[in-house]
Amino acid sequence: PVGGRFSARQAAVYDAVLRVKNEATKMLAPGVLWHEYHQEVGKVMTSELIGLGLLDKADVAQQHPDQPAYKKYFMHGTSHHLGLNTHDYGALKTPMREGMVFTVEPGIYIPEEGFGIRLEDNVVLRSGQEPFNLMRNIPVEREEVESLMNA
């Protein structure tokens, strides 16, 4: 936050994005298929957007399967391959494998309120355990970010 502290609304949105990022990270594992991963992350995001009052259950009930309601506030993908190129190309129809590196970068953008929050981690898939977070030493909890901004 530019002023050193998040407003109450910014804090609520930040925490929602952080929860989505954390849940999305746990879903990345060898054998997972891209479309299933993105569908599951979409469910988590939908729940958070309902909690923030940005969507309601009627929006979700009336959504078209090809254009989920959450896309109004989260219009990009959650993850992409990471390699030699910034947005490295990878096979989207084959299962994820151990050793692959992915971004995890959900965001919520609220133009009518004049702000958005996007968080990103880069992770390496491992068998039988959560992905290894290459950015694990960077402050990401809201309180840590505010503390750093006020140091």
Where are these regions (language model features)?
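Active-site neighborhoods and metal-handling regions in enzymes and metal-associated proteins
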Residues: 1-151
